């Protein structure tokens, strides 16, 4: 009974008085909006919503709306094949894994203990090369209870020495209770360096340890090199599955069963700010691996997944925005069912992360796990028409990538022949074009830059020596190189390169394009000089001290004034005059155009060169 004494109905049919929604009605509304905005040509005869469809780098179509008509086949249950909804039946969140790569064992130990005392639950240690020496592993792990905080190694070429050093630290822990990952990954070594590395020693080490340490994993199939080379999600998945198959083959040759071999593997993936693709990638990966282990003669296996926030998406400029990127990526990795997640500190692209950035990275995971209750429901995205369709489409695309690699003799042969490099280069070319045109925007760098930001200073990372392996890209680098040139100019001349915004007409008619031009030029480190509404833009240009001008106004004001103002600007000393708008042959004296979808990198590079900025 309610307080008024009435009885509540068992079924509140709140929508009973409304007509049943129909797709056709929604399509008519979409058509009206698109037609009003000029995006729908009168002669267009397809479904209007098709103009809102986008494509991933794998060619997967993303529809603007998914309905019950798009319902996919049931994905099963967590802990059961095909493991789309999770490899673990209990779904108890994920392992908060922190990365340490400091070569100083004392400094590494201080950071390790600080992480473990403040929310981290496992450690990922880079060993060898410019990172921690295998012999220093004991000092770095001093005071760490290895039965409570598992260690995952990334040992590079020194995996045998690193493995022996870590195994020595397990003294006092029952052999059957030793957990962790030794991290041997000869396939990734080849991808990183271009040099062949024999898989057999790692397989033999695995066979030796299998019976003694049943919970210890020894090999990692890592997708990060393919992601960082600019690859698509399906290309990353296909290469990782192919690496996993290569390890299955060599492990079974060493005497392990398919099931025992599969239990020795861990898989690493990039988590990006594209949350739905990250969720779908992790779900699709488990489905693919279950299929591989099943057809290989074993039982369908779940996949031990380690998700790492993407280094490719990190920026050096306005690095605080990286906190937002890594939060979204961590959210997606958790929802996608990763067993362990590493959130890279926001300053990881600048230098050695400091205590503050490490704390923020840890707390990002703590908030999502504890405050947001993200782990309270297993696979919360499961059943979403969009997510399920995207998972299926990505799994199919990745399987095609995997079979192409297998057709060429497997991952080692495909790397050696250049097939993998060429496939990744094709995708990077497409991605680079979208980055340059800002169709893939980078907030704080290519869009909404903050020219007056104070640089974040960090201890430098070891210099990377280019090798013969896969390239490593960071999406913001081309724009950041322009900003570096601007900074050098500022240091030498006391001011930044400038562009005068020659505003035409009243404020209302020029503001939109003036704001667009201002945002664009700042992305290249060029300071915009905006005089506001002026009666004589040529006179204002003379007083500005700028050498390049950009007309900003409405199409109507361009038709009436652009040619005369451009001529006046050239007479006043402008060495180049650009126009904020689409190119047109009707304009005279215009040396370049800046508009939505233009090659912003080309416009900015050309402008800096015109201004003599080295």
Question: Which residue ranges define each predicted feature?
Answer:
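Catalytic alpha/beta active-site cores
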Residues: 1-274, 296, 304, 340, ...
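A short beta-alpha structural unit
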Residues: 348-349, 384-389, 501-507, 538, ...
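Charged, low-complexity surface patches
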Residues: 44, 104, 278, 282, ...
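Generic structural signal of hydrophobic/aromatic residues within well-ordered alpha-helices
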Residues: 26, 30, 137, 166, ...
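Hydrophobic/aromatic ligand-binding patch that stacks against planar heteroaromatic rings
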Residues: 114, 208, 332, 447-448, ...
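Active-site capping/gating regions of soluble enzymes
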Residues: 2-13, 247, 266-447, 576-583, ...
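Intrinsic disorder at enzyme termini
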Residues: 2-28, 37-39, 48-54, 58-84, ...
């Amino acid at each position: 009974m309610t307080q008024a004494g009435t009885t509540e109905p068992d079924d509140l049919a709140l929508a009973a008085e409304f007509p049943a929604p129909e797709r056709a009605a929604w399509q008519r509304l979409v058509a009206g909006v698109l037609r009003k905005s000029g995006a729908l040509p009168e002669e267009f005869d397809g479904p209007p919503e098709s103009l809102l469809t986008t494509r991933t780098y794998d060619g997967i179509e993303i529809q603007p709306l998914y309905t019950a008509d798009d319902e996919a086949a049931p994905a099963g249950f967590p802990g059961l094949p095909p493991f789309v909804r999770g490899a673990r039946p209990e779904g108890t969140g994920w392992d908060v894994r922190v990365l340490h790569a400091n070569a100083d064992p004392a400094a590494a130990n201080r950071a390790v203990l600080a992480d473990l005392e403040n929310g981290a639950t496992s450690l990922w240690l880079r060993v060898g090369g410019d990172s921690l020496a295998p012999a220093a592993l004991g000092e770095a792990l001093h005071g760490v209870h290895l039965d409570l905080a598992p260690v995952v190694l990334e040992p590079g070429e020194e995996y045998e020495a690193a493995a022996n050093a870590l195994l020595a630290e397990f003294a006092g822990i029952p052999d059957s209770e030793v957990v962790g990952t030794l991290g041997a990954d000869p396939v990734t070594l080849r991808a990183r360096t271009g040099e062949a590395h024999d898989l057999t020693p790692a397989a033999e080490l695995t066979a030796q340890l299998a019976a003694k340490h049943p919970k210890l994993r020894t090999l990692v199939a890592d997708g990060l090199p393919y992601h960082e080379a600019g690859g698509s999600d399906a290309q990353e998945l296909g290469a990782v599955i192919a690496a996993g198959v290569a390890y299955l083959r060599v492990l079974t040759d060493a005497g392990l069963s398919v099931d025992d071999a599969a239990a020795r593997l861990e898989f690493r993936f990039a988590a990006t700010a594209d949350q739905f693709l990250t969720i779908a990638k992790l779900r699709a990966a488990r489905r693919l691996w279950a299929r591989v282990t099943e057809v290989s003669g074993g039982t369908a296996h779940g996949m031990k997944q380690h998700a790492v926030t993407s280094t490719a998406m990190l920026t050096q400029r306005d690095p605080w925005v990286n906190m937002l990127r890594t939060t979204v990526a961590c959210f997606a990795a958790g929802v996608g069912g990763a067993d362990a997640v590493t959130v890279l500190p926001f300053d990881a692209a600048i230098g050695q992360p400091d205590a503050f950035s490490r704390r923020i990275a840890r707390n990002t995971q703590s908030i999502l796990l504890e405050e947001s209750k993200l782990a309270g429901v297993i696979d919360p995205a499961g059943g979403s028409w969009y997510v399920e369709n995207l998972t299926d489409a990505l799994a199919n695309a990745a399987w095609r990538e995997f079979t192409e690699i297998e057709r060429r003799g497997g991952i080692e042969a495909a790397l050696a022949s250049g097939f993998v490099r060429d496939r990744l280069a094709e995708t990077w070319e497409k991605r680079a074009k979208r980055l340059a045109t800002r169709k893939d925007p980078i907030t704080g760098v290519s869009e909404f830059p903050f020219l007056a930001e104070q640089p974040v200073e960090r201890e430098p990372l070891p210099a990377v020596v280019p090798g013969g392996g896969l390239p490593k890209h960071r999406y913001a680098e081309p724009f950041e190189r322009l900003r570096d040139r601007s900074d050098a100019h500022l240091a030498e001349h006391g001011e930044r390169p400038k562009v005068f915004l020659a505003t035409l007409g009243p404020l209302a008619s020029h503001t939109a394009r003036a704001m667009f031009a201002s945002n664009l030029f700042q992305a290249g480190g060029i300071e915009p000089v905006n005089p506001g509404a002026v009666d004589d833009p040529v006179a204002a240009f003379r007083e500005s001290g700028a050498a390049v001008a950009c007309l900003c106004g409405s199409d109507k004001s361009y038709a009436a004034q652009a040619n005369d103002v451009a001529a006046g600007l050239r007479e006043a000393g402008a060495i180049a005059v650009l126009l904020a708008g689409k190119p047109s042959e009707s304009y005279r004296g215009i040396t370049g155009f800046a508009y939505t979808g233009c090659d912003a990198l080309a416009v900015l590079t050309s402008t800096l060169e015109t201004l003599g900025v080295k």
